[in-house]
């Protein structure tokens, strides 16, 4: 069914369950219950009693994000004035919506780029993001993938480039 979310895992040798390492969204039974509804409303429920471990979520036929800014051009590298931030520490509510609400303040500082410390999935909920797992998934602790796209779109509308810190060589643990 188009737009419906489905959870799945790979079952290996009849007893090892793994989420898809290329998953754009996961369910984590140990950490998702600590994410508030204001940050990640209507989360897909974890299939308690049916499996264990991290579950991949896919949504075939999902509506693509409708970008307001489709022609953004980033500043030349030599002209970048970058503000690096960690969503969790920069705004008290630690979510993309509150970050969007502070973009005018950041713009007044004279910057033209925001560098996000790694926003991808990482183990637990409290981290700088330098312990990544599931490199294609954004960590739900900061908000939904749609809200992240809205953040990028809002930055571009103000002339701000968005740089995402990625640390593939730091992967460990559940990765």
Language model segments and positions:
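Short, flexible loop/turn elements at secondary-structure junctions
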Residues: 86-91, 120, 139, 168
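Hydrophobic faces of well-ordered beta-strands that scaffold small-molecule active sites
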Residues: 81-85, 114-116, 162-164
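Short, acidic/polar
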Residues: 93-106
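The feature marks proteins involved in alpha-glucan
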Residues: 2-80
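Aromatic- and acidic-residue-enriched segments that line the glycan-binding/catalytic groove
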Residues: 22-41, 126-138, 170-175
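Aromatic-lined carbohydrate-binding/catalytic grooves of carbohydrate-active enzymes
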Residues: 105-147, 160, 171-172
């Amino acid at each position: 069914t188009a737009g419906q979310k489905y959870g799945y895992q790979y079952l290996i040798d009849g007893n090892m369950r793994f989420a898809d390492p290329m998953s754009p969204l996961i369910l984590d039974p140990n950490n998702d219950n600590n994410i508030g509804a204001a940050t990640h409303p209507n989360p897909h429920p974890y299939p308690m009693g049916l499996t264990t471990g991290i579950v991949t979520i896919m949504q075939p036929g999902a509506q693509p994000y409708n970008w307001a800014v489709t022609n953004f051009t980033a500043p030349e590298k030599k002209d970048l004035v970058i503000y690096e931030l960690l969503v969790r520490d920069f705004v008290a509510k630690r979510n993309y919506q509150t970050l969007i609400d502070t973009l005018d303040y950041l713009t007044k500082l004279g910057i033209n780029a925001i560098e996000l410390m790694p926003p991808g999935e990482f183990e637990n909920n409290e981290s700088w993001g330098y312990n990544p797992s599931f490199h294609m998934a954004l960590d739900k602790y900061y908000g939904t993938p749609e809200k992240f796209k809205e953040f990028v779109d809002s930055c571009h509308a103000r002339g701000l480039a968005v740089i995402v810190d990625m640390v593939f060589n730091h992967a460990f643990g559940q990765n």
